């Protein structure tokens, strides 16, 4: 589910003194440098040092698995990937502030993805735009819903080997992008929160709600994969994800604890 994540951490927030301008450049492939700025990459992750601030941004799934179209990161995989990133940079990324979260899933469709855009009509508070045929956005100041043709994106990125696995199917990807993480979640979110099952549930719920509140239409020429209601939608994708992450048990435990608190 997690895709692009933006980590931001300052030297002053670390328990042990580290100079990013001295420590980071030897651990990455450098693209540009100046007296107080270094930009480079660690695999697919963009690494930027601005004086005493370290910014790391990229697909956590692609960093850990090498691709971001088929599998999801379990809660434990998220923890492993953040620990791996921490070890490679020698910086505790669990302490970093999270400034952006993208969460998404790919769907196998009957038709090419763009023919479904006319069925997704309106979402209150969001500006709908379809500038390019293969992509549909619902945008506002703190978040964005994005529906796009995953295979087209992979062709642009020249992911030829991965495309072989998908050549016989149409792949639609739906992402919910949290642009103002602190505002949406009502407080600072740190790297360690990403592998908290309770926080993962909150993110998943917003991804789910984002799709469900869109007003839907119907195009008779299209054999649309339609979700008849919440139960059908949950069976098709949310249940699969929650089952993989063991989130049903977490949800039941969380609900039980909340009920106990109310009764007491």
Question: What residue spans do the PLM features occupy?
Answer:
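Conserved small/polar residues in nucleotide/adenosyl-binding loops
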Residues: 254-261
């Amino acid at each position: 589910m997690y895709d692009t994540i933006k980590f931001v951490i300052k030297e002053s927030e670390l328990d042990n003194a580290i100079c990013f301008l001295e420590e980071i450049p030897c651990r990455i492939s450098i693209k540009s440098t100046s007296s107080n700025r270094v930009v480079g990459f660690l695999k697919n992750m963009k690494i930027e040092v601005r004086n005493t601030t370290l910014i790391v941004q990229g697909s956590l799934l692609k960093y850990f698995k090498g691709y971001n179209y088929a599998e999801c990161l379990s809660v434990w995989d998220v923890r492993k990937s953040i620990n791996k990133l921490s070890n490679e940079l020698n910086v505790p990324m669990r302490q970093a502030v999270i400034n952006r979260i993208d969460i998404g899933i790919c769907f196998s469709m009957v038709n090419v993805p763009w023919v479904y855009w006319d069925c997704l009509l309106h979402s209150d508070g969001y500006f709908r735009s379809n500038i390019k045929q293969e992509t549909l956005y619902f945008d506002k100041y703190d978040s964005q819903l994005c529906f796009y043709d995953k295979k087209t994106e992979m062709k642009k990125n020249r992911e030829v080997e991965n495309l072989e696995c998908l050549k016989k199917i149409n792949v639609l990807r739906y992402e919910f992008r949290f642009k103002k993480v602190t505002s949406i979640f009502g407080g600072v979110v740190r790297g360690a929160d990403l592998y908290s099952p309770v926080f993962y549930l909150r993110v998943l719920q917003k991804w789910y709600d984002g799709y469900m509140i869109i007003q839907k239409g119907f195009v008779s020429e299209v054999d649309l994969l339609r979700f008849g209601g919440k139960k059908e939608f949950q069976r098709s994708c949310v249940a699969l994800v929650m089952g993989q992450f063991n989130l049903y048990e977490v949800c039941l435990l969380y609900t039980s604890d909340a009920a106990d608190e109310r009764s007491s």
